[in-house]
Amino acid sequence: MTIAVGRAPSRGWFDVLDDWLKRDRFVFVGWSGILLFPCAFLALGGWLTGTTFVTSWYTHGLASSYLEGANFLTVAVSSPADSMGHSLLLLWGPEAQGDLTRWFQLGGLWPFVALHGAFGLIGFMLRQFEIARLVGIRPYNALAFSAPIAVFVSVFLMYPLGQSSWFFAPSFGVAAIFRFLLFLQGFHNWTLNPFHMMGVAGVLGGALLCAIHGATVENTLFEDGEGANTFRAFNPTQSEETYSMVTANRFWSQIFGIAFSNKRWLHFFMLFVPVTGLWMSAVGIVGLALNLRAYDFVSQELRAAEDPEFETFYTKNILLNEGIRAWMAPQDQPHEKFVFPEEVLPRGNAL
């Protein structure tokens, strides 16, 4: 027997910190937690502060806080004024100059919440990568979570960066998001954009697949227990499978004539559909940031302008979009002092 005698390698501060971050505890921290927890705390705290106390009078001419009488559906952390451009509006920057009240008035909370929120979401994705590596599984959860991150970054950051200022980004609130949706439709005809169509197909298709999958598994359970209902019938730690893939395959083969042949392909498809849809919608929003057009059926517009009896759903939607632009712009951008004479407002079938 050989005995090797030597000195244990010294552990530096990095090794000690690595052990502490990855220690098994109720809430795992990890290296990703250094980014996730502070950013998530500051983003959520900034949003709660803004919706509780901070007005949007100086940026949008609106009341947007509980203090002013708004409710949960109408409060918001509003985007900065158009005149601020793409400034980060740092508290110590030239705009606020360290004055917290002035910073609130200028809309400084919006870039604060947007940037910390984006980095918080990225930190959560990295958390899934990190834990997957430690547990020894594939990182597809992190890959899936990249889709909502792409949508958030494209809508809240890429779109306003392509426009004249942060003002045109959605404010952080329920009714504020609805206003932004109307804006996208009126100024970009977003619902006719093929990337939006792919996004809708992905989200609704993912919901459909989720419902079908859950129902099929429930339908093909073959090992029941003594519980009064499905939710009480199983031991949550049982190792064996309790539903029949073969029976499910036979059922859907009779319904559609085709069915998934194995679970890997089935679950990959359930991952692929919503993730691809969200990614495509994010690509479409980046296109809107650059003011790219999708489908413009000019021939129908010209014919509708010449022939009062010719109208399609497309030309009708174009008129509705013109109405949104004409009536929304003065309300949405009061600082521009838009005035639309009566004769230029859309009326009837005339484009």
From Swiss-Prot:
NCBIfam families: psbD
Membrane association type: Multi-pass membrane protein
Bound cofactor: record note: The D1/D2 heterodimer binds P680, chlorophylls that are the primary electron donor of PSII, and subsequent electron acceptors. It shares a non-heme iron and each subunit binds pheophytin, quinone, additional chlorophylls, carotenoids and lipids. There is also a Cl(-1) ion associated with D1 and D2, which is required for oxygen evolution. The PSII complex binds additional chlorophylls, carotenoids and specific lipids.
Signal peptide start and end residues: none
Keyword terms of this UniProt record: Chlorophyll, Chromophore, Electron transport, Iron, Magnesium, Membrane, Metal-binding, Oxidoreductase, Photosynthesis, Photosystem II, Thylakoid, Transmembrane, Transmembrane helix, Transport
Function as written in the Swiss-Prot or TrEMBL entry: Photosystem II (PSII) is a light-driven water:plastoquinone oxidoreductase that uses light energy to abstract electrons from H(2)O, generating O(2) and a proton gradient subsequently used for ATP formation. It consists of a core antenna complex that captures photons, and an electron transfer chain that converts photonic excitation into a charge separation. The D1/D2 (PsbA/PsbD) reaction center heterodimer binds P680, the primary electron donor of PSII as well as several subsequent electron acceptors. D2 is needed for assembly of a stable PSII complex.
Binding site for chlorophyll a PD2: 196
GO molecular function annotations of the record: chlorophyll binding; electron transporter, transferring electrons within the cyclic electron transport pathway of photosynthesis activity; iron ion binding; oxygen evolving activity
Ranges that cross the membrane: 39-59, 123-139, 151-164, 206-226, 277-293
Listed GO biological process terms: photosynthetic electron transport in photosystem II
Protein name: Photosystem II D2 protein
Pfam families: Photo_RC
CC per GO annotation: photosystem II; plasma membrane-derived thylakoid membrane
Enzyme class: oxidoreductase
EC number, as in UniProt: 1.10.3.9
Annotated family: Belongs to the reaction center PufL/M/PsbA/D family.
Record keyword Phosphoprotein present: no
Enzymatic reactions: 2 a plastoquinone + 4 hnu + 2 H2O = 2 a plastoquinol + O2
Coiled-coil annotated spans: none
Positions with a binding annotation for pheophytin a: 128, 141
Subunit structure: PSII is composed of 1 copy each of membrane proteins PsbA, PsbB, PsbC, PsbD, PsbE, PsbF, PsbH, PsbI, PsbJ, PsbK, PsbL, PsbM, PsbT, PsbX, PsbY, PsbZ, Psb30/Ycf12, peripheral proteins PsbO, CyanoQ (PsbQ), PsbU, PsbV and a large number of cofactors. It forms dimeric complexes.
Residues where a plastoquinone binds: 213, 260
Organism: Nostoc sp. (strain PCC 7120 / SAG 25.82 / UTEX 2576)
Main location: membrane
Record's miscellaneous remark: 2 of the reaction center chlorophylls (ChlD1 and ChlD2) are entirely coordinated by water.
Binding site for Fe cation: 213, 267
